[in-house]
């Protein structure tokens, strides 16, 4: 089977599979803040992220998942050569050149999905968690900043800060569903410091010290949000409304998770409030890039 054939059917999450990105989230709600002539490119980036993550979240055997993700990396080669073979890479063809999307960041999205598919994200070492959030969150924000016209070093640094904070927050949000699917994003160092020794990911959810294990992750997310806020004025003006809205929405989510405490892991993950997100989009539209 050719690489492009495999990539053309990357696999989707099965009926019982865990997926954290299929639902409407703050990134989708903030899309109206992307200029109309760039919105299709932003949607193409988000669609690519969803396609590769669907492979990792699907019910296929691990070797098959990793084979499909390897095929997606080959499909990126085809995209660069001007020969995309899948709907999502065809949609990326014009944005790749028009907005100078960094190929390495598209590949980072695939590598993050491969970490999920390969079983790395089960109580990973802190260094692996940091790498994962850089590849999944950092890459995504850097790509979206490029779509919005900023490929500068400052935008890259901002993207790394916001991407890490955003991804740590959504990992905490999805802790319950992920654990029930056999994943656990909490770093082993935090689990050890909290005194959690469990035979399964599901047992971690019931442990009375769960809040203590989550606290360092939440603290890092909060610190990186603060870093991103400090860096935002260095980002190009047209990119700021969208990126500011994404930052604020995820900061709000982190506060909600903190208020819910241990219950956040056993209750359904909170979704962004539609009214609040819509109000934020309107506010940033009128506020502009200031």
Region spans (language model):
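Catalytic cores of Mg2+-dependent Asp-rich isoprenoid enzymes
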Residues: 1-166, 172, 176-290
């Amino acid at each position: 089977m050719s690489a492009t054939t495999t990539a053309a059917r990357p696999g989707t999450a099965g009926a019982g599979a865990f997926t954290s990105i299929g639902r409407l989230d703050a990134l989708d709600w903030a899309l109206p803040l992307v200029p109309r002539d760039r919105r299709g490119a932003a949607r193409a980036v988000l669609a690519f992220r969803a396609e590769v993550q669907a492979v990792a979240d699907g019910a296929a055997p691990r070797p098959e998942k990793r084979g499909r993700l390897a095929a997606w990396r080959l499909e990126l080669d085809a995209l660069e050569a001007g020969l995309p073979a899948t709907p999502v890479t065809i949609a990326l063809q014009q944005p790749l050149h028009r907005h100078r999307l960094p190929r390495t960041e598209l590949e980072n999205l695939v590598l993050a999905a491969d970490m999920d598919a390969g079983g790395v994200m089960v109580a990973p070492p802190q260094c692996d968690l940091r790498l994962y959030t850089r590849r999944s969150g950092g890459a995504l924000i850097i790509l979206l900043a490029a779509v919005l016209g900023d490929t500068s070093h400052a935008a890259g640094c901002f993207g790394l800060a916001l991407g890490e904070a955003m991804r740590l927050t959504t990992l905490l949000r999805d802790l319950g569903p992920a654990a029930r699917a056999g994943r656990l994003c909490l770093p082993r160092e935090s689990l050890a410091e909290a005194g959690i020794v469990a035979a399964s990911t599901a047992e971690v959810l019931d442990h009375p010290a769960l809040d203590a294990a989550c606290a360092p992750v939440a603290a890092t997310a909060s610190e990186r949000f603060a870093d991103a806020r400090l860096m935002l004025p260095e980002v190009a003006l047209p990119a700021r409304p969208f990126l500011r809205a994404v930052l604020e929405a995820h900061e709000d989510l982190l506060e909600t998770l903190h208020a819910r405490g241990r219950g956040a892991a056993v209750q359904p993950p909170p979704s962004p409030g539609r009214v609040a997100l819509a109000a934020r989009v309107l506010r940033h539209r009128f506020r502009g890039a200031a």
